[in-house]
Each structure stands twice: as structure tokens, then as C-alpha cells.
């Protein structure tokens, strides 16, 4: 059976560029693993591959939902498994590319089972958040379960609420309460991008400047005119959330810019923390000039489950 390849890494680490270069050399079907790219209309601020690029290098699971349509790790797993099967039927390599760690985990390990919602506890947490604020509840989460808190932004109300609900209701950490059910069909090889932090921060700034030049503020105005509910996941996404605040007149453009950069760096840090906990066959420094050729080596050389650090010093 044709192996699937996971290409994982933090935001702005060059995943798309590397994926299309690999597609120039191998018969590859690119499958997006990104919880924001599934939504239509969120194009510039998400760094969604351009329509022209996607016409040349099709990306599955991009623009498959309206922003107010629900989507989840479970639905992603169903969609991705279907795309993988289609690629293999055509004799092509499924290349799954993205930075949404939970989607990768769900695809590889199946869907996690967690305790059901507790309405009374949820109401109590909501009331506490009204008075203390979500960052305070995030600090409480960090005390109870540092690992879970490290992967959740201080203003991510939905995930903070759910995490505290599980911990306080079950008396267990998230990892202790979580049980994954499922397996991945066929062989799988994982490649994790590990960029130098200074290089990644520079890329984040450069990419954000490009977004602004490409019309990100117009995109914010267009999305605001569509009157989507502010609590929708896409509306709370990094970059968008900060500029919706600006659009509503609650901060200056300079403040929104700095807040968006800081939030994007924090997102990259959380993603890096997640991927450090993942096992992989290969690790790659994408800042190297020969990163594309090294990736091709990783995708084609024989493997027997061994771990390689090609082009990356883990010392």
C-alpha cells in the first residue's frame, strides 16, 4: 500500500512551499490539515494558498465549509480518510500538510472520547469568566493542567471552558481523561518542521506585512459586513480577532498590528510545543537552502521505523 506522509509544522514555517516543490518531483495529492483553511472567505489572513496556486497544485479540504457551518476533528478525519483512499486508488502519494495538531492526532489515532458536557459546571465557569475574565480562567487551567494550558490561547473561551469542565468534572487532566479510538489505514511517515525561532518570527512579520499589502483590511471589512457571529471559530482566529477589534474601533491600527504579531508568535509556540510531543520519522529545518532536496530524500528513502534528524540539529 502507498504510504501517506504527514508534513507538520508551525505557522509560517514554509509548509506550502515545501509541499508544492515535493509535488513537482513526486506523484502527490496535497491534503490540507488546517482548521481555518476549511472555511470560505477567510483567505488573506489565513495565508490560504492562492487560487492560482491551487489550480496548479490542488489542495483537498480547502474551502469546504461556510464560516457558520460546524466542523470538527471527527468530520476532518472522515474527509481526510476519503481523500487518502482516493489518492491511493489513483496510485498517488497522500501528502497531508498543515499545522493543526489535533486534526493530525485524530487522523492518526482516531477520535478521542471525553466526559460529556456538564451544563451546571459550564454555567458556573461562564459566570466566573464574566467577573474574572478568560485569562484568569486560563491561569487556573495552567495550575490544574499545565500541558493542556500550553496548547490553548488565553482568550480561547470555548477550549478553556471545555478543558476546565473536563478537569473539574472528572478530577483528571485532559490527557488522563482522553482515550483515542481508531487506527490509521496503511503505512504512515511523519515529517516535522523545526525552524529556528528567530527565522520563524521574521517570517511571521514578513508574511503579515504581505497580507496587509494584499488587502487584509478589505477582507476584514467584507467579513464584518457578512455579520457572522463573533463566537464562530473562524472569527476568533489569530490575526482576524485582533483586526476585528480594530474594525470595531476598540484599538488603533498599530495596536492591532502588534497584537496580531504577538498572537501569531504565541500560536507558533503552542504548535511547536504540540509537535515536540509527537514522534516522527524525520525532522527538518526549513530555513536551510537545501530544505526542498532534503525533504525529497525523506519522502523517498527506505525506512524501517527509524528516526532521522536530517538537516536539523536537535542538540
Swiss-Prot record:
Source species: Acidithiobacillus ferrooxidans (strain ATCC 53993 / BNL-5-31)
Annotated family: Belongs to the IPP transferase family.
Protein's name in the database: tRNA dimethylallyltransferase
NCBIfam families: miaA (TIGR00174)
Its biological purpose: Catalyzes the transfer of a dimethylallyl group onto the adenine at position 37 in tRNAs that read codons beginning with uridine, leading to the formation of N6-(dimethylallyl)adenosine (i(6)A).
Enzyme class, broadest EC rank: transferase
Lineage, uppermost ranks: Bacteria, Pseudomonadati, Pseudomonadota, Acidithiobacillia, Acidithiobacillales
Subunit structure: Monomer.
Cofactors required: Mg(2+)
Amino acid at each position: 500500500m502507498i504510504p501517506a506522509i504527514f508534513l507538520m509544522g508551525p505557522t509560517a514555517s514554509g509548509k506550502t512551499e515545501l509541499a508544492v516543490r515535493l509535488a513537482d518531483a513526486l506523484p502527490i495529492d496535497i491534503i490540507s490539515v488546517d482548521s481555518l483553511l476549511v472555511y470560505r472567505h477567510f483567505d488573506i489572513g489565513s495565508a490560504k494558498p492562492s487560487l492560482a496556486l491551487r489550480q496548479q497544485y490542488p489542495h483537498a479540504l480547502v474551502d469546504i465549509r461556510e464560516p457558520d457551518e460546524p466542523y470538527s476533528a471527527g468530520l476532518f478525519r472522515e474527509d481526510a480518510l476519503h481523500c487518502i483512499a482516493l489518492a491511493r486508488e489513483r496510485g498517488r502519494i497522500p501528502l497531508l500538510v498543515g499545522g493543526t495538531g489535533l486534526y493530525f492526532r485524530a487522523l492518526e489515532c482516531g477520535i478521542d472520547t471525553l466526559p460529556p458536557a456538564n451544563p451546571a459546571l459550564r454555567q458556573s465557569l461562564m459566570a466566573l469568566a464574566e467577573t474574572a475574565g478568560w485569562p484568569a480562567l486560563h491561569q487556573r487551567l495552567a495550575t490544574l493542567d499545565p500541558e493542556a494550558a500550553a496548547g490553548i490561547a488565553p482568550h480561547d473561551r470555548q477550549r478553556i471552558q471545555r478543558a476546565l469542565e473536563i478537569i473539574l468534572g472528572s478530577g483528571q487532566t485532559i490527557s488522563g481523561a482522553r482515550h483515542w479510538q481508531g487506527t490509521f489505514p496503511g503505512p504512515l511517515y511523519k515529517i516535522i518542521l523545526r525552524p529556528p525561532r528567530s527565522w520563524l518570527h521574521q517570517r511571521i512579520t514578513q508574511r503579515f506585512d504581505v497580507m496587509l499589502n494584499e488587502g487584509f483590511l478589505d477582507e476584514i471589512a467584507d467579513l464584518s459586513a457578512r455579520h457572522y457571529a463573533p463566537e464562530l471559530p473562524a472569527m476568533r482566529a489569530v490575526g482576524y480577532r485582533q483586526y476585528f477589534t480594530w474594525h470595531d474601533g476598540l484599538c488603533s491600527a498599530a495596536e492591532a498590528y502588534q497584537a496580531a504579531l504577538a498572537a501569531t508568535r504565541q500560536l507558533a509556540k503552542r504548535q511547536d510545543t504540540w509537535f515536540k510531543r509527537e514522534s516522527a520519522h524525520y525532522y527538518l529545518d526549513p530555513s536551510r537552502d537545501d530544505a526542498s532536496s532534503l525533504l525529497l530524500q525523506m519522502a523517498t528513502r527506505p525506512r524501517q521505523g527509524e528516526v532521522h534528524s536530517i538537516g536539523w540539529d536537535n542538540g
